[in-house]
């Protein structure tokens, strides 16, 4: 009988954003902890705004969805301990938030990676990506000179331009519009 192997995980952190050159949709760029790989994940503007606001230390006058979720989990004595980006199905990334309750029991909650990153940042939680995702998710080797990845790599390594573009887009968006988006 074959021995079941534990999945291999790599630690990642948020590197920055890059707008898709064709659609202007935000691309969240995750960087492997040792700086060897970048993993681009296309996300929605509301999630990009939530991540960017937190990274920039901005507090909005009213709590947004991720702030509310953080407050609920915290006030109930829980803690998000990590985000596991575990799979890609039909080009869509799938992830799990691992939430520890006050008794120490861990609960696995299915989520989109973008929401998971927004919450992991608020809890200072670990972000991991499975080897399965790395094998199927088109990671970018930092030193690999492929023309189709040069724009993402350039912004990820020095993402001031992308931050400025995202900042302008967010400044031009009415804050009330974030409540009108539907999934």
Model segments located where?
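Divalent-cation
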Residues: 2-183
